[in-house]
Amino acid sequence: MTNILRPTNFEDVIGQEDVVKRLKINSAGCKISGSVMPHVLIDGPPGLGKTTISSAIANELQVDMYTCNAANLRSVKSILPYLMGISPRAVLFIDEIHRLPKLVEEFLYPVMEDFKMSISSGEETEEMELPQFTLVGATTSGGSLSQPFYDRFTIKEHLNFYSTDELAKLARLNAKKMGLTVSDRDLIEIAKRSKGTPRILNARLKWYQNYILSVGNDGIDAIFNTQGIDCFGMDVYDRLYIEVLEKNVGNPLGIKSISSLTGIAVETIENSIEPYLVREGYAVRTQKGRALGKTRRK
C-alpha cells in the first residue's frame, strides 16, 4: 500500500509547495551542470513526507538511493557498508538522523566535506576517498543535531502540516489509486480527521475502505467513531493528554509527569501528540511546563 500511494517525483507531490520548488531548482541545476547536489536536511513532524521528498530528490537526479535509519547506526562500523558501497552522485538517506551517536556524527564530518574517511586497523590508519554523493537527513528534531553537524547541511528545509484542502486533494488522488469511490463530502471529512498529516490520511483512507467493504456505509461519523476518532481527528491518546491538562488548569505539567499520568511514552508525546495539539491551540508549551491552550473541544 505504501508503494502504491507514495509519489516518486516532485510533480506528484501535493503540498509543501515552497520546499518542493526550491528542491526542484537545486536538483535541476545540479543535473544540468553534472555536479553533486549539496547535502540536505529535512526537518518536521512525523508523517509529512520527508522520506517521499528524499526519494523524489534521487529520482529527479536519476541517481541511486541508499536508505538507512540512524537508530541502527550505533557505531562507525555500522555505517561503513553504506559508504564503501555508494555509487557516484548517489543519495544516502538517513532517517531519524538526530539519533546518530556523536562518534558517528564526527566521523561523517570529513566524509561530508571532502568525501574522505579514515579507517583504523590496529595501529594503522588508512584514508579512503569516496565518490561524491548527497547525504539527505530526515529528522523530527533538528535542534538535537550538534551545531557542527547541522552546519554541514547546505540545504535545510522544514515541512509544515498540511491544510484541509491539500489533504482532501491528496485523499482524492490516493482513493483513486486504491480503487475507492469517496464522495466530496467524505473526502473533506477524512481530511479534517487526519491532523494535517498525509501518513495519517492514508491510514484513515484504509480504515474507511475496510469499513465500507466489511460493514457498509453507515456515514462518516459512525465509520470513525468505531475507530475512536472524533471529528477533530483526535484519538484516545490525544484526548487522554488533553484530559490530564484539563484536570490541572493553572498547574503546568512537565512532560515526564504527563507521561506518568497517561502511560504514554515521552517520545510519543513529543513526536506524535504534541505537534498537532500545540499547532491547533489545544495545548501550549511554557517554561513551567505544558498547559491547556485557548482552543477547546466542543
Predicted regions and their residues:
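Dynamic helix-loop-helix/coil hinge segments at AAA+ ATPase domain boundaries and subdomain interfaces
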Residues: 1-22, 230-232
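Walker A/P-loop
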Residues: 28-70, 81-88
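Conserved AAA+/SF3 P-loop NTPase catalytic/coupling segment centered on the Walker-B
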Residues: 56-57, 76, 88-118, 142-152
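AAA+/SF3 P-loop NTPase mechanochemical coupling elements
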Residues: 120-138, 153
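Conserved C-terminal helix/linker of AAA+ ATPases
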Residues: 187, 202-205, 209-231, 238, ...
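C-terminal helical "lid" of AAA+/P-loop NTPase domains
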Residues: 188-193, 199-214, 242, 257, ...
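Terminal-proximal interaction/regulatory segments of ATP-powered molecular machines
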Residues: 246-298
